[in-house]
A protein has these predicted regions:
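Aromatic- and glycine-enriched glycan-recognition loops and surfaces
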Residues: 1-21, 34-38, 205
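Conserved, mostly hydrophobic/aromatic
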Residues: 9, 231, 311, 372, ...
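Loop/turn elements at helix/coil->beta-strand transitions in domains of secreted/extracellular proteins
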Residues: 10-17, 47-52, 216-220, 225-230, ...
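Extracytoplasmic
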Residues: 67-198, 393-404, 410, 420, ...
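Carbohydrate-binding surface patches
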Residues: 137, 309-312, 317-319, 354-395
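Glycan-recognition surfaces
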Residues: 202-205, 209-321
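Catalytic cores of secreted or luminal carbohydrate-active enzymes
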Residues: 304-353
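Intrinsically disordered, low-complexity Pro/Gly/Ser/Thr-rich segments with frequent PxxP/GP/PP motifs
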Residues: 416-437
């Protein structure tokens, strides 16, 4: 089974990854995980999976519609529920009372669609801290899906999904288990979805939480250390995941799929290099797997590709056949100097500090040094120079001012000293990377 496979893969010094989709089917039209997040996350954790890519094929967005709420109730699992009419709440935005004498409360609240309004209960009182059943009572309307977030005490958020309703009865109720504290609690009801990007964020956050809960559960059941799962968000950059990815997972794809085409690798680089401010420790922009050794890429292109991915803190996932790798390709992807730059504990992505035929990238490192990459984007040779002193005043890079800098190129081992300027001569598509101290 997969659990045994994970052990075999780990014994080879590798980690096991798995894949599914934030949709009804995967990109190969196999069963996927939308709506099954907790079950599938628990399965992955039991298997010992260490890396999980969550794709975007056959995706179904969350509804921007909200139900018509007439009351809520709160109860412990073995107690009588305490009901709160909407008249006990404060309405904001476009939320408004609508009369319906057939309802127990005599009215309901509409106007919660697409983050346009919300219901806030400030007086939900319980006797002790713990888990409670929150029931949302609604008036049925429309054979279409609806959605609410229940936000508790300005902190935890709980999703409530409402399927299409049939009108055999006037009302329906839907429940979620929430954490409440002793005394008065604040409960807000709203639908935050105004765009597909909002929908993506909440769905990927749902899976991210499910993975964390699952690894903690398995560790507790087995009485062993927790084995976390790296969560890779793959919605191809459509919903600007760099804005919300850190709240959902560990890395997020910035573009559609990579190919072993030099022009496409450069396009992905151009898009991803601009996103440096969004990366942080444990949260990274993902320009997709490495194509080093694939297609018709030249040696210089392979070196530049690997160098740029290292500078941008990209996950270094090999996309080539590990069983059939040339010594040249192996020497590139196992360059310990470049891998150390990528894995530096400061975890700051390189910033492009000069743009042109030759781009210059600067990546601050934990020991106070700076990695400086010269990247020749052209199909002909080029010369370039760069004044290191310009990095002293750069608040992001923060190079320490010195009268003389020592620099070492990480591919050739070339060493130099300079009072400020580094000059390079580059072949077509070539990159050089210096550690400057």
């Amino acid at each position: 089974g997969i659990a045994n496979l994970a052990k075999q893969v780990n014994a080879m010094g590798l980690k096991l990854g798995a894949y599914t989709s934030n949709g009804t089917l995967t990109c190969e039209d196999l069963p996927a995980s939308l709506g099954r997040e907790q079950y599938d996350a628990y399965t992955l954790a039991k298997w010992g999976v260490e890396y999980f890519k969550y794709d975007y094929c056959h995706h179904i967005p969350i509804s921007r519609y909200a139900p018509l709420v007439y009351s809520i109730s709160v109860s412990q699992f073995d107690s009588h529920p305490m009901e709160y009419s909407v008249h006990n709440a404060v309405l904001s935005g476009l939320a408004r009372f609508m009369t319906d004498t057939k309802l127990p409360s005599g009215s309901y609240v509409s106007g919660l669609d697409a983050n346009q309004g919300r219901i806030t209960y400030n007086n939900v009182e319980v006797d002790e801290d713990g888990k409670y059943v929150l029931t949302v009572n609604i008036k049925k309307k429309g054979a279409y899906e609806k959605y609410l977030i229940a936000k508790i005490n300005d902190d935890e958020e709980y999703e409530i999904l409402f399927p299409p309703q049939k009108h055999y009865n006037l009302t329906a109720r839907f429940q979620v288990i929430v954490n409440l504290k002793t005394g008065k609690n604040k409960i807000e009801l709203f639908n935050p979805v105004t765009s597909n990007a909002d929908s993506e964020m909440y769905q990927y956050r749902r899976m991210g939480k499910a993975l964390k809960d699952a690894t903690a559960r398995v560790a507790k059941e087995r009485k062993q250390a927790e084995k976390p799962i790296v969560f890779s968000i793959c919605e191809w950059g459509w919903g600007k995941p760099y804005n919300w990815g850190a709240k959902a997972g560990n890395l997020w794809r910035t573009t559609p799929d990579i190919r072993p085409w030099w022009i496409w690798i450069k396009i992905i680089y151009e898009h991803t290099v601009k996103l440096y401010k969004y990366a942080s420790k444990g949260h990274y922009n993902d320009p997709d797997m490495l194509e080093v050794g694939n297609g018709k890429l030249t040696y210089n292109q392979n070196v530049s590709h690997f160098s740029l991915w290292c500078m941008m803190n990209a996950p270094l996932i090999l996309g080539n056949d590990l069983r059939n790798m040339s010594e040249q390709v192996k020497s590139i992807v196992t360059n310990r100097n470049m891998i150390a730059i990528n894995q530096d504990p400061l975890a700051k992505q390189a910033k492009r500090v000069k743009k042109g035929v030759v781009d210059v990238l600067a990546k601050p490192l934990a020991d106070g040094s700076v990695a400086v990459c010269f990247f020749n984007k052209s199909s002909h040779g080029a010369k370039a120079k760069f004044d290191l002193n310009s990095l002293v005043d750069d608040k992001y890079v923060g190079l320490q001012k010195k009268t003389e800098y020592a620099a070492k190129e990480q591919w050739s081992g070339e060493k130099l000293t300079t009072s400020g300027t580094i000059s390079v001569s580059l072949e077509k598509c070539q990159s050089k990377v210096y550690i400057v101290k």
